[in-house]
């Protein structure tokens, strides 16, 4: 069987999905999970784009051991320098730079305003420049699927001659059909001089729902590497979903003689961790990881599954690490039991972080008695978020009822400074938001508000993820509590703190400016 490399770009392209931003600590923990999952390469970010992106790539590179860590760069000298600075301490055989430039007519005319020869010269110059610092260089022709094939062949030929070790073919806007994308890969395999000496990679977007199908067609026509994201997250409609591509190869190995290094029993835990970190919940009918995948409502289906699971299931829940045993721990559980449970899901924490998780676990166990898997994922993702020592909710009081005008009073504190306010609203959540606005003198616009249960049962926690627009910019916040009003207030304050820090109105170590 032919081995297919899995290039995971959850931390880079996946994070570009609206609302999916991750802190440095969250990226590091997700990278450790991806390493355990068995991916071959991890694209950790775009270092030149921001100090946070640079730090994330640098930290991921120092945290993981086995995968090749990749940084993204345009065909621009400062981009390449930034990737090198972020990855220079990593062994040469475990670091890669991914350089790209658009090649399609529409990009040449409207975005780059360059002629073909100018683009070829940039490829020659900057792939060569990257090669001075990296043994492993991936080159992508952005929007390859809408590029004239003769020019695409010339672009890849130029990149290989300049030192590229991987050639990546992106279907950037998810435009290609499987048969034509497969034919394109075959044409490149046969027509690009030197391509037999490099990896041939594909990067498919899901705008027409064909990212996985196009990736499979590419592999069937000679691709040796597939770029994916967990849960298929990514810009617009997302990317080729890791879990779908890998499980198709596993379930249909009778027709697809390819294998990967993915430990499929860690797919579901990895998916759940990402969900809790980003707040992006896969649809219930999402293949492989959706909540409905192993549920059967039809009486005929239920009868068949009870008699023999394979009547209506082509894979077992255990194949992806999914267990029906969701109740895990309680108030009398100790550190050893908690650590063992976390490690069974591939979650490895340093001692300081684990201690914080344990403290929050014991607090939660005292409040709701029974702690479920999703509770643990939520606690871990909460602890991993970079601490923002801004305003904290010290006290709140809500007065509401079906015959009363809902009112809320809040006390907020940052450093030694306290602010108090009370307001009425259209419901308790609206009232507490307005009280916070009044206390801080800010008027955000609520763009998105999502609440979901964490765990099961009447005493489940509520997790709130929201997005605020403040002065034209978006800021996300997240809060978890057994009280949904409190969870909402925590998330709201979290988003406002991000705005205040970004604008220099609040010091990161606490205190208003």
UniProtKB/Swiss-Prot annotation:
| Region (Regulatory domain), start-end ranges | 392-513
| Sequence positions that bind Mn(2+) | 13, 203, 205, 239
Give residue ranges for domain Pyruvate carboxyltransferase. Answer: 4-268
SMART domains associated with the record: LeuA_dimer
- A Gene Ontology MF term for this entry? manganese ion binding
Q: Name one Pfam family in it.
A: HMGL-like
Specify where it is mainly localized.
cytoplasm
Q: Which terms under GO biological process does the entry name?
A: L-leucine biosynthetic process
Which cofactor(s) does the record list? Mn(2+)
Alphabetized CDD domains for the sequence: DRE_TIM_IPMS (cd07940)
- Report the EC number(s), separated by commas if there are several: 2.3.3.13
Q: Which InterPro entries match?
A: 2-IPM_HCS-like, 2-isopropylmalate_synth_dimer, AIPM/Hcit_synth_CS, Aldolase_TIM, LeuA/HCS_post-cat, LeuA_allosteric_dom_sf, LeuA_bact_synth, PYR_CT
One Gene Ontology CC term in the entry = cytoplasm
First-level EC class:
transferase
Q: In which pathway does it act?
A: Amino-acid biosynthesis; L-leucine biosynthesis; L-leucine from 3-methyl-2-oxobutanoate: step 1/4
Q: Where does it localize?
A: Cytoplasm
Quote the catalytic activity from the record. 3-methyl-2-oxobutanoate + acetyl-CoA + H2O = (2S)-2-isopropylmalate + CoA + H(+)
Which keywords, in A-to-Z order, does the entry hold? Amino-acid biosynthesis, Branched-chain amino acid biosynthesis, Cytoplasm, Leucine biosynthesis, Manganese, Metal-binding, Transferase
Q: How does it assemble?
A: Homodimer.
Q: Which family does it belong to?
A: Belongs to the alpha-IPM synthase/homocitrate synthase family. LeuA type 1 subfamily.
Function text? Catalyzes the condensation of the acetyl group of acetyl-CoA with 3-methyl-2-oxobutanoate (2-ketoisovalerate) to form 3-carboxy-3-hydroxy-4-methylpentanoate (2-isopropylmalate).
Q: What is the protein named? A: 2-isopropylmalate synthase
Gene assigned in the entry: leuA
């Amino acid at each position: 069987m032919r081995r297919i490399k899995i290039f995971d770009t959850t931390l880079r392209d996946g994070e570009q999905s609206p609302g999916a931003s991750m802190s440095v600590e969250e990226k590091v923990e997700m990278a450790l999970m991806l390493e355990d999952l068995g991916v071959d390469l991890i694209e950790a970010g775009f270092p030149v784009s921001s100090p946070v992106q640079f730090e994330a790539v640098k930290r991921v590179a120092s945290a993981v051991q086995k995968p090749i860590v990749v940084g993204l760069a345009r065909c621009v000298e400062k981009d390449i320098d930034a990737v090198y600075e972020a990855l220079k301490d990593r062994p040469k055989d475990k670091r890669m730079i991914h350089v790209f430039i658009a090649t399609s007519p529409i990009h040449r005319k409207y975005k780059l305003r360059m002629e073909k020869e100018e683009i070829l010269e940039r490829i020659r110059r900057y792939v060569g420049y990257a090669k001075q610092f990296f043994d492993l260089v991936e080159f992508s022709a952005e929007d390859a699927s809408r590029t004239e094939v003769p020019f695409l062949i010339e672009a890849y030929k130029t990149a290989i001659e300049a030192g590229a070790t991987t050639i990546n073919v992106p279907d950037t806007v998810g435009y290609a059909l499987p048969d034509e994308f497969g034919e394109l890969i075959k044409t490149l395999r046969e027509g690009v001089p030197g391509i037999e000496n490099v990896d041939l990679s594909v990067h498919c977007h899901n705008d027409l729902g064909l990212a996985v199908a196009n990736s499979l067609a590419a592999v069937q026509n000679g691709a040796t590497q597939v770029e994916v994201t967990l849960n298929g997250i990514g810009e617009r409609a997302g990317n080729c979903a890791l879990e779908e591509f890998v499980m198709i190869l596993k379930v249909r190995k009778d027709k697809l003689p390819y294998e990967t290094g993915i430990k499929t029993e860690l797919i579901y835990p990895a998916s759940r961790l990402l969900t809790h970190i980003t707040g992006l919940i896969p649809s219930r009918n999402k293949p492989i990881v959706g909540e409905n995948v192993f549920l059967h409502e039809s009486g005929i289906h239920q009868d068949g599954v009870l008699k023999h699971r394979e009547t209506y299931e082509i894979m077992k829940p255990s194949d992806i690490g999914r267990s029906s045993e969701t109740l895990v721990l309680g108030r009398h559980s100790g550190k050893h039991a908690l650590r063992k449970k976390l490690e069974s899901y591939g979650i490895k924490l340093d001692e300081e972080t684990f201690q914080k998780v344990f403290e929050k676990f014991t607090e939660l166990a005292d409040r709701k008695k029974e702690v479920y898997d999703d509770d643990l994922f939520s606690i871990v993702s909460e602890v991993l978020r970079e601490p923002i020592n801004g305003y904290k909710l010290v006290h709140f009081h809500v007065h509401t009822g079906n015959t009363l005008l809902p009112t809320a009073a809040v006390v907020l504190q940052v450093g030694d400074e306290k602010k108090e306010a009370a307001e009425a609203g259209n419901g308790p959540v609206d009232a507490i938001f307005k009280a916070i606005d009044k206390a801080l003198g800010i008027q955000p616009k609520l763009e998105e508000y999502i609440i979901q249960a964490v765990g099961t049962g009447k005493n489940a926690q509520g997790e709130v993820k929201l997005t605020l627009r403040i002065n034209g910019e978006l800021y996300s916040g997240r809060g978890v509590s057994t009280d949904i009003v409190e969870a909402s207030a925590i998330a709201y304050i979290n988003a406002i703190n991000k705005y205040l820090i970004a604008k220099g109105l609040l010091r990161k170590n606490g205190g208003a400016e």
